[in-house]
């Protein structure tokens, strides 16, 4: 629900701060993204089962609820047209004067690399990480902050790209384990290749017209996600 909460934050910024800069919209989107992420984590903590299939499904359900709220308020405020640029990812807006915000992700990615081993340990669970001397809550909060800010920057610049952050890291982990120090750059390269494929398909399917990359990645990503779920269920049963 992080990206959907970011879009809700963008809508709120457009309603209350219509003439302000993209920086302010990014800040509001980051705050909402963090709120959506904490909501997701709060629900997960109350559920006893931590099944690998159940957790992402809960995230998808939360995304659906937040997305519905966003569309409802956008419709009531007659802002569907204004919000459409952020509903689905589109590289057409990556032009001079718009994409410079993406440079802010560089130091954030460096911080993610520096904390990658700590993130790996925290993924083993709070009790195990604490026994190893890790400040679990601090590391988790840093990770959440990085995810929320980076997600907001990308959505403000390009728009939402469905399933990218869900399927690519999971596929990389399937083949390479859970070592984030290796998986971060592998996920980046794999995600870039996936986006390039979706962009090419979006440009050639109905040439000379173009399909938004968010629509293409949504169709392909949902299919891959179903395959991953069915594969997991087959291995378990």
Language model features by range: what are they?
Residues 1-237:
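Alpha-helical transmembrane segments in inner-membrane proteins
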């Amino acid at each position: 629900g992080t990206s959907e909460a970011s879009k809700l934050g963008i809508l709120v910024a457009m309603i209350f701060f219509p003439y302000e800069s993209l920086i302010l919209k990014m800040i509001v989107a980051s705050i909402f993204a963090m709120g959506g992420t904490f909501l997701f984590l709060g629900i997960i903590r109350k559920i006893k089962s931590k099944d690998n299939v159940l957790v992402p499904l809960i995230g998808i359900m939360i995304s659906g609820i937040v997305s519905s709220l966003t569309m409802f308020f956008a419709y009531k405020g007659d802002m569907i047209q204004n919000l459409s640029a952020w509903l689905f990812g589109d590289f057409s807006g990556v032009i001079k004067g718009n994409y410079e915000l993406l440079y802010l992700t560089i130091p954030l990615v460096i911080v993610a690399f520096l904390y990658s081993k700590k993130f790996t340990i925290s993924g083993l669970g709070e009790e195990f990480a604490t026994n190893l001397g890790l400040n679990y809550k601090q590391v988790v909060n840093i990770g959440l902050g990085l995810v929320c800010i980076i997600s907001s920057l990308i959505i403000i610049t390009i728009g939402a790209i469905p399933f990218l952050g869900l399927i690519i890291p999971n596929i990389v982990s399937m083949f390479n384990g859970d070592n984030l120090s290796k998986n971060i750059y592998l996920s980046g390269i794999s995600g870039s290749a996936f986006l390039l494929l979706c962009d090419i398909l979006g440009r050639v399917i109905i040439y000379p017209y173009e399909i938004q990359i968010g629509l293409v990645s949504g169709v392909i990503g949902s299919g891959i996600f179903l395959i991953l779920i069915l594969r997991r269920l087959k291995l378990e049963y």
